[in-house]
């Protein structure tokens, strides 16, 4: 799990340093700790927006797929995670980013990674995700207390930060299915230690063409989290309590993904697996957005200068 957040922080850091380089004519990628090159070996850093960003497995499989294909598959056939073959640049002046709404920043960030989505497709996904389901128009406001700024990520439907990505993943996935001519019903398998399960079910509830099955450790979540999951409405939502811990649930889900015989049987029955866990690039890319938005908000409010480093 830590590697997923490391990836997000590295990409966010590169975005900020790229904007600094545009303004000053220089940047220092070595200051990104632990560093793009060290954290993502074999991944190139692009200094201009690429025409297309493809994805490959972290296990070295040479095959590449488009963003929409990576979102649909969730996990590579060799069991690795999908990562971009190059990191795109957020080549938008900070003064413009600072004046944008959350939805507009989301488009600028996500369009760099999800390059096979059209502008209309991506903007439609964003509009349907970040709407009245959030109890504030800012979506992710910044507040200050005792000299520390707090990025509020609890304004979504389930009051968990997972809502930030899981509100848009169903829309990305159904759009990806249409783009790739997928006729099968998509079965989302998700392991959770609490928050992800409820947020994922809330996001996918009654979404046409999908079903979602959440596995959680029977004695590893709080009573409130369990009640949230087992009372979730939706004709396509299912939840299963297992004997074991979260790692057991996650391992079982990955084994099902890697069972090619099971995949073939499902295909014959008109189904295919995908994931709503953070192994899916459709979860990771939306999570980059709120870091960029937070930084731009600090610049907008005059709290920091463009290019100034911050602790996150």
Regions found by a protein language model. Give the residues of each.
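Hydrophobic alpha-helical signal peptides and transmembrane signal-/tail-anchor segments
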Residues: 1-17
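PLP-dependent amino-acid enzyme catalytic core
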Residues: 46-312
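Short, Lys/Arg-enriched N-terminal segments with co-localized hydrophobic residues
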Residues: 14-23, 30, 39-50
